[in-house]
Amino acid sequence: GRPPLELGGVLYCDRETVDKIEKMKVCTCLNPLHTAMSIYGCMLGYNLISAEMADEDLRSFIQKIGYIEAMPVVVDPGVLNPYEFIGAVINRRLPNPFMPDAPQRIATDTSQKLAIRFGETIKAYEARGLDKSNLVLIPLVLAGYARYLKGIDDNGQPFEISPDPLLAELQAIVNPLEVKEGEQDFSCLKALYSRCLLYTSPSPRDA
Protein backbone atom coordinates (compact mmCIF):
# COMPACT_ATOMS: atom_id res chain seq x y z
CA GLY A 1 0.00 0.00 0.00
CA ARG A 2 0.93 3.66 0.06
CA PRO A 3 0.22 6.50 2.46
CA PRO A 4 -2.93 8.51 1.60
CA LEU A 5 -0.94 11.50 0.36
CA GLU A 6 -3.90 12.61 -1.74
CA LEU A 7 -5.51 13.74 1.54
CA GLY A 8 -2.78 16.37 1.70
CA GLY A 9 -3.32 17.50 -1.87
CA VAL A 10 -0.80 15.25 -3.63
CA LEU A 11 -1.85 14.26 -7.16
CA TYR A 12 -1.06 10.81 -8.49
CA CYS A 13 -0.69 10.64 -12.26
CA ASP A 14 1.20 8.86 -15.02
CA ARG A 15 4.43 9.98 -16.69
CA GLU A 16 2.62 11.48 -19.68
CA THR A 17 0.59 13.72 -17.39
CA VAL A 18 3.73 14.75 -15.51
CA ASP A 19 5.29 15.78 -18.83
CA LYS A 20 2.20 17.85 -19.68
CA ILE A 21 2.33 19.59 -16.31
CA GLU A 22 5.98 20.42 -16.90
CA LYS A 23 5.23 21.87 -20.34
CA MET A 24 2.33 23.88 -18.94
CA LYS A 25 4.63 25.40 -16.32
CA VAL A 26 7.76 25.87 -18.42
CA CYS A 27 6.14 27.11 -21.64
CA THR A 28 3.20 29.15 -20.33
CA CYS A 29 2.27 29.50 -16.68
CA LEU A 30 5.48 30.28 -14.76
CA ASN A 31 8.87 30.20 -16.43
CA PRO A 32 8.14 32.63 -19.29
CA LEU A 33 6.82 35.15 -16.77
CA HIS A 34 9.93 34.71 -14.63
CA THR A 35 12.23 35.26 -17.61
CA ALA A 36 10.35 38.35 -18.80
CA MET A 37 10.55 39.84 -15.31
CA SER A 38 14.22 38.97 -14.92
CA ILE A 39 15.27 40.68 -18.15
CA TYR A 40 13.36 43.89 -17.52
CA GLY A 41 13.90 43.78 -13.76
CA CYS A 42 17.67 43.90 -14.24
CA MET A 43 17.44 46.83 -16.64
CA LEU A 44 15.04 48.73 -14.36
CA GLY A 45 17.15 48.28 -11.25
CA TYR A 46 15.01 45.82 -9.31
CA ASN A 47 16.56 43.30 -6.94
CA LEU A 48 13.40 41.38 -6.03
CA ILE A 49 10.69 39.81 -8.16
CA SER A 50 8.13 40.70 -5.49
CA ALA A 51 9.08 44.38 -5.82
CA GLU A 52 8.58 44.20 -9.57
CA MET A 53 5.05 42.94 -9.00
CA ALA A 54 4.23 46.25 -7.30
CA ASP A 55 4.87 47.97 -10.64
CA GLU A 56 1.54 47.97 -12.46
CA ASP A 57 3.18 48.12 -15.88
CA LEU A 58 5.33 45.04 -15.22
CA ARG A 59 2.43 43.19 -13.63
CA SER A 60 0.22 43.93 -16.65
CA PHE A 61 3.11 42.92 -18.92
CA ILE A 62 3.36 39.39 -17.56
CA GLN A 63 -0.41 39.00 -17.22
CA LYS A 64 -0.83 39.69 -20.92
CA ILE A 65 2.05 37.41 -21.87
CA GLY A 66 0.50 34.57 -19.91
CA TYR A 67 -3.23 35.00 -20.35
CA ILE A 68 -3.44 36.56 -23.81
CA GLU A 69 -0.42 35.39 -25.81
CA ALA A 70 0.68 32.05 -24.33
CA MET A 71 -2.56 30.59 -22.99
CA PRO A 72 -4.15 29.94 -26.43
CA VAL A 73 -1.55 27.20 -26.99
CA VAL A 74 -1.09 25.99 -23.40
CA VAL A 75 -0.65 22.26 -22.82
CA ASP A 76 -3.54 21.28 -20.52
CA PRO A 77 -2.56 18.33 -18.30
CA GLY A 78 -6.13 17.71 -17.21
CA VAL A 79 -5.37 17.24 -13.51
CA LEU A 80 -4.48 20.93 -13.07
CA ASN A 81 -6.33 23.91 -14.50
CA PRO A 82 -3.84 26.16 -16.34
CA TYR A 83 -5.88 29.29 -15.57
CA GLU A 84 -5.98 28.51 -11.86
CA PHE A 85 -2.26 27.69 -11.91
CA ILE A 86 -1.20 30.93 -13.57
CA GLY A 87 -3.58 32.87 -11.35
CA ALA A 88 -1.84 31.47 -8.27
CA VAL A 89 1.55 32.32 -9.78
CA ILE A 90 0.63 35.94 -10.56
CA ASN A 91 -1.46 36.70 -7.49
CA ARG A 92 0.28 34.68 -4.79
CA ARG A 93 3.74 33.39 -5.67
CA LEU A 94 5.38 36.26 -7.53
CA PRO A 95 4.20 39.07 -5.17
CA ASN A 96 5.21 37.09 -2.07
CA PRO A 97 7.89 39.14 -0.22
CA PHE A 98 8.84 36.07 1.80
CA MET A 99 10.09 34.42 -1.38
CA PRO A 100 13.16 36.62 -1.93
CA ASP A 101 13.84 35.70 -5.53
CA ALA A 102 16.03 38.05 -7.54
CA PRO A 103 15.78 38.87 -11.25
CA GLN A 104 19.57 38.62 -11.40
CA ARG A 105 19.43 34.95 -10.38
CA ILE A 106 16.62 34.10 -12.77
CA ALA A 107 18.46 35.86 -15.62
CA THR A 108 21.30 33.34 -15.33
CA ASP A 109 21.69 31.26 -18.53
CA THR A 110 18.85 33.08 -20.28
CA SER A 111 20.25 32.11 -23.69
CA GLN A 112 19.52 28.49 -22.81
CA LYS A 113 15.92 29.24 -21.80
CA LEU A 114 14.44 31.36 -24.58
CA ALA A 115 13.76 28.50 -26.99
CA ILE A 116 11.60 26.51 -24.58
CA ARG A 117 10.00 29.44 -22.77
CA PHE A 118 9.05 31.48 -25.84
CA GLY A 119 10.07 29.63 -28.99
CA GLU A 120 7.64 26.79 -28.27
CA THR A 121 4.74 29.22 -28.12
CA ILE A 122 5.74 30.80 -31.42
CA LYS A 123 6.02 27.38 -33.06
CA ALA A 124 2.66 26.32 -31.61
CA TYR A 125 1.02 29.38 -33.18
CA GLU A 126 2.39 28.35 -36.55
CA ALA A 127 1.45 24.70 -36.11
CA ARG A 128 -2.15 25.61 -35.26
CA GLY A 129 -2.47 28.27 -37.92
CA LEU A 130 -3.00 31.05 -35.38
CA ASP A 131 -2.38 34.69 -36.20
CA LYS A 132 1.21 35.47 -35.17
CA SER A 133 0.47 39.20 -35.32
CA ASN A 134 -1.27 38.67 -31.97
CA LEU A 135 2.16 38.05 -30.47
CA VAL A 136 3.30 41.47 -29.33
CA LEU A 137 4.74 41.10 -25.84
CA ILE A 138 6.64 37.86 -26.38
CA PRO A 139 8.62 39.57 -29.17
CA LEU A 140 9.08 42.48 -26.77
CA VAL A 141 10.71 40.10 -24.28
CA LEU A 142 13.08 38.93 -27.02
CA ALA A 143 13.83 42.52 -28.02
CA GLY A 144 14.45 43.27 -24.34
CA TYR A 145 16.99 40.47 -24.22
CA ALA A 146 19.02 42.13 -26.98
CA ARG A 147 18.90 45.34 -24.95
CA TYR A 148 19.83 43.45 -21.76
CA LEU A 149 22.95 42.04 -23.43
CA LYS A 150 24.30 45.58 -23.79
CA GLY A 151 24.62 45.74 -19.99
CA ILE A 152 23.22 49.27 -19.74
CA ASP A 153 20.28 49.98 -17.44
CA ASP A 154 17.35 52.31 -18.07
CA ASN A 155 19.30 55.22 -16.56
CA GLY A 156 22.22 54.69 -18.90
CA GLN A 157 24.40 53.12 -16.22
CA PRO A 158 26.24 49.78 -16.58
CA PHE A 159 24.95 46.77 -14.66
CA GLU A 160 26.39 43.30 -14.16
CA ILE A 161 24.95 40.76 -16.57
CA SER A 162 24.21 37.36 -15.04
CA PRO A 163 26.42 34.39 -15.99
CA ASP A 164 25.60 32.70 -19.28
CA PRO A 165 27.60 30.19 -21.34
CA LEU A 166 26.97 32.18 -24.54
CA LEU A 167 27.45 35.64 -23.06
CA ALA A 168 30.63 36.64 -24.90
CA GLU A 169 29.33 35.29 -28.21
CA LEU A 170 25.95 37.02 -27.93
CA GLN A 171 27.42 40.32 -26.78
CA ALA A 172 29.67 40.27 -29.83
CA ILE A 173 26.59 39.81 -32.02
CA VAL A 174 24.78 42.85 -30.57
CA ASN A 175 27.96 44.94 -30.30
CA PRO A 176 27.08 47.08 -33.37
CA LEU A 177 23.86 48.27 -31.68
CA GLU A 178 23.82 51.42 -29.58
CA VAL A 179 21.47 51.94 -26.63
CA LYS A 180 18.84 54.66 -27.04
CA GLU A 181 19.95 55.56 -30.54
CA GLY A 182 17.56 56.19 -33.41
CA GLU A 183 17.56 54.29 -36.69
CA GLN A 184 20.19 51.55 -36.79
CA ASP A 185 21.01 48.44 -38.75
CA PHE A 186 19.19 45.74 -36.78
CA SER A 187 20.23 42.90 -39.08
CA CYS A 188 22.41 41.42 -36.32
CA LEU A 189 19.25 40.48 -34.42
CA LYS A 190 18.56 37.69 -36.89
CA ALA A 191 21.82 36.03 -35.85
CA LEU A 192 21.03 36.60 -32.17
CA TYR A 193 17.61 34.97 -32.24
CA SER A 194 18.71 32.21 -34.57
CA ARG A 195 21.36 31.35 -31.99
CA CYS A 196 19.05 31.53 -28.97
CA LEU A 197 15.81 30.25 -30.44
CA LEU A 198 16.96 28.11 -33.37
CA TYR A 199 14.00 29.94 -34.85
CA THR A 200 13.73 33.35 -36.51
CA SER A 201 10.06 34.37 -36.81
CA PRO A 202 8.39 36.64 -35.83
CA SER A 203 11.14 39.25 -35.67
CA PRO A 204 11.46 40.91 -32.25
CA ARG A 205 12.16 44.14 -34.12
CA ASP A 206 8.45 44.20 -34.95
CA ALA A 207 7.57 44.57 -31.25
Model-assigned labels for residue ranges:
Residues 1-16:
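Primary mode marks residue(s) on the alpha4-beta5-alpha5 output face of response regulator receiver
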Residues 141, 145-146, 156-158, 162, ...:
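Long mid-to-C-terminal assembly/interaction modules of large eukaryotic proteins
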Residues 17-25:
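Conserved phosphate-binding loops in nucleotide/dinucleotide-binding enzymes
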Residues 199-206:
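Conserved small/polar residues in nucleotide/adenosyl-binding loops
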Residues 26-41:
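Conserved phosphate/anionic-ligand binding catalytic regions in large, soluble enzymes, centered on
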Residues 19, 36, 46:
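Solvent-exposed loop/linker segments at secondary-structure transitions
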Residues 40-162:
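C-terminal catalytic subdomain
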